[in-house]
Structures are given as structure tokens and as C-alpha cells.
Amino acid sequence: MDVFLGLSEDAIHRVVWTDELLDEWERVIIRERRRSPETAASVTAAIREFFADGRIDRNQYDHLIDEMPGKDRDDRPHMAAAIAARADALVTSNTADFPAAPLAALGLRVVGPDIYLNELLDDHPQEVIATIVRIAAEKTRPPKTPADILNALRGAGLREFPDRAQERL
């Protein structure tokens, strides 16, 4: 999450979000014990505060939800919001639940985080590396290095991007 938000802070890409998406992220991250309830709540509160311009209100996409493809009805609001926001890509680790071809016909590309970050690295190599270095420098408790940031991405399941970014450090 830090890297995606940092890239948005540095204007390398734009993060769009909904209240529903942040609420779901918070529930999942707590359930999977990847963050404490307090830490998860502080992350979503920070996104709401610092990335308020990326918020897509329910009334902007509600009318699209029933038209969205896919078996999982819980994912349809995310697709509808991305389309309403005119997002270039819907980045998810769960690409199987987001039918690529029907969404592409609606102008939305579904892509996993490893591929997406690799594309950003190809298009903006210096900026992406500078963001990773900045994020690491801002971590003080405990201190982190850029390699630590990339190792955290490996731990989150990214395979190629951390190695490619490490080569550029």
C-alpha cells in the first residue's frame, strides 16, 4: 500500500478509491492479520485525508453496478467505480474475479500489482526508484532501507518488480 500511495503522492499515477473499497480493505487486512485494527484504521483515515481528491462517491457509479460482469457481486462496485472514474487500470491481486475481456470493452484494464508496477518502472524508472527511496527514508520506527521496502513487496507476493527495482537502486 505504501508504494502505491507514494507513487500517487509523487504524481506517477492516480489512486482512486471508494468508501466501500477502503472498508473492505480494512476488514480483509485485519482478518488476515496483516495489520492491527488500529493500524488498518489509521491507513484508511490517512487515505481519506490525503487522497480525498481520489474519492469516487457512490452516486457516481451506483447506476453501473448491475451492469458489471463477473460472478462475485461484491466486486461489481469496484469495477463500476473504476469505470466511473475513467481509471486506466484496476489493480488487484485477485484478477480472476475481474473478467478482463468484458471490462476491456468498457475501457478498463485489469492487471495484477506486479505487472502494473513493472509498467510504471518501465515508463518512469527514475521517478519510481526515487519514490521507493523516499518512502524508506520516511520510515523511522523502525528505520527502513529501500531494500526493506522491496522485500515487503516480495512478502506480499510480488515476484518480478522488487528484483527489477533492486537492480536500479
Region roles according to the model:
Residues 1-33:
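PIN/NYN-family metal-dependent endoribonuclease catalytic core
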Residues 12, 52-55, 107:
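A generic structural signal for alpha->beta connector loops
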Residues 22-24, 62-67, 116-120:
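A short acidic, often aromatic-flanked loop/helix-cap motif at beta-alpha or helix-coil junctions
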